[in-house]
Structure formats: C-alpha cells, structure tokens
Amino acid sequence: MTFSPKKIDKYIFKKFIGTFLISLLLIIILVIVFDAGEKIDKFVANEAPLRKIIFDYYLNFIPYFVNMYSPLFVFITVIVFTSRLAANSEIIAILSGGISYHRMMIPYLVAAALIAMASMALNFWVIPGSNVERLAFENEYVKNKNTAVRNVHYQIAPGQFVFVESFSTWNNTAYKFTLETVEDNKIVSKVSAESAAWDSLSGAWQLRRYFIRDYTSGLTDHVKSGLQLDTVIALTVEDFYSNALTVQTLDYGDLESLIKTQKLRGDANVMYALIEKHNRWAMPFSAIILTIIGVALSSRKKRGGIGWNLAFGIALAFSYVLFQRFSQMFVYTDVLPPGIAIWIPNVLFAIIAAILYKMAPK
C-alpha cells in the first residue's frame, strides 16, 4: 500500500499547526491567570485602570510572551502529536507505505520554518512597538519608578568624554557630572558640576555649582565657576535609558544605530543591545532545531507512550532555556563576545539534533 506524499504533507502540517495553536491558547490563558494573580495587589495599590490592564499591558504582553517561548511551544507540540502518530502506528504505516523518513520530515520543517519566519518578523518590527506600551505600563503601575543608573562613562564625540556618578530616572538629573576634552592624549579642558538636570524644552543640560578648568595655557589652569550654566552637548536623556529593557523597544534599524553610537562612546551598555540583536536572529532558528529533535525523539513507538516522551521533551526544552540564559552570562562577564555566546545553545542543540536524527528509526 502506498500513500500520496501530498496527502501526508497536508495531514502532518495540519496536525502540527492545529496542535501548536491549541497548545498556545491554553498556555496563554494559564500564564495570564498566574500573572494577574501575582500582580493584582500592585494593580490595586497603584490604581491601574482596567482598560489599561487589558489593552496596554496584556494585549502587548501576549505577543511578547508567545514570541519569546515559541520555540519551546513548537517543541512540545511536535512531541505531543508525533507521539500520538507513533502510538497509533501511523508513522509505521507512512514509512512502510513507500514514504521515506527524510520525506516525512518535509511538512515538519515547512511548518517550523513558517513559525520561525513569523517569529523573526515579530522580533524585528512588531514586538518592539508593543514593548513600548507594555514597559510603560509596568513602569507606571508595577515597578518602582525611582531608579538610578550608576557609574556612567560615555565618549560622546571624538576627544570628548562624560563621566556621571549616578543618574536619576525620577527627575532626569545626573549627579557628579564631568565633561573632559582631550587632544593629543592630554586633557585640555574639564567641566565639573554637582548636578546636571535635563531641560526637555531646550534640549540642554542645566549645570549646577559648576567649575570649568582650561589647561591650554601651560602649567597654570584657568578656572571659572558659577551656580548655574546651560550647555548643549552630544548627550540626551535617552542615552541613560539604553539598558536591557529599553533595547526591547527598538526596531532592528534603531537597534543597529544604537549599537554604533554606544560603541563610539565606549558605553558598557552596548552589551545589552548586542545580546538583543543576536537573540532576535538566534531564537527563530531554534524552532527548526527543536522540531528535528522532537520528531527524532517521539517517532518511535515506546512502552511509556506520550507521557514518557512529553516528560523527557519538557525536561530537554527547559534545559535549552536554562542554557540560553546561562550563555548570556558569558557576555556579562566578558568571557565571550555576544555573537558567539548567544549562538552556543543553537550550535550545541543542532549537534544533538543531528545525532538523534541519525539514530531515529527509518
């Protein structure tokens, strides 16, 4: 008996996408229930309007959460419905009907590739915009608004360096502000101030209790001081918000521009932007890798059935997530560059996928 490859393709593809969407819907409902239960006290304490909770937070939280864990949802989906096919001896029937194991993989890979492309599009253009509203809501009604950025060092232009001991996001003020101008490896001028407050109307910094030292006259330096001075430099208040959360709000073009600017300034926060950039590329590919692993693990009929496959699959899926988070520590500790560290989980699990695929019954 032979089977039409096209019918098998449609059958597997529909099973894949259908199970994926149903699983996704159930997980979304569970996550919203648990998340709301965890945050309900803060919603009430901060008087968050119901309309904002639904439309500003959860409507934007859902695509963020779904996209972040879509490779794992794909993996669990493949484990569940492929185990059912194997338990019902459907895979044996397909293989004995003249369709090779490699040919049977095509609808799996097509479905995984479509999900990966959708995830990539969301990563680059949709999620950043929705993150703006989600993070704004969290800052307003969930998190502590009085936060500070400490020990900031920026190169704002060739030969110009800014040093700030701390920056308060509550009043947009930099404390212990210093601006140094360097020529031929020598400091030619230095501006120091107790604080520098951002004026959003004029786009200038208002220095308070400032000192200006000019070292261009040889051994003696000229000092000028005062209580207040407005100055415009190549630094804006947005530069102090470029951390691990704010890079999530930038589309791919803006993210690339931020990376170039931060590299010029010697900004240590560039690692957050680089991690975000490589995560946006690496995560969609993991859906394809985990699909291959899922099929290889669950296509054999086992005594334990779906339960054993699902338990092992979930354990492997969460080990992937943990390893993905652990690989970022290599970036934070300067052990590996982001371009290598972020891709390590995919490379390792691609090797595992190749081994399991080779061992799968054909």
Regions found by a protein language model. Give the residues of each.
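Structural signature for solvent-exposed beta-strand/loop edge elements and short helix-capping sites
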Residues: 157-202, 206-210
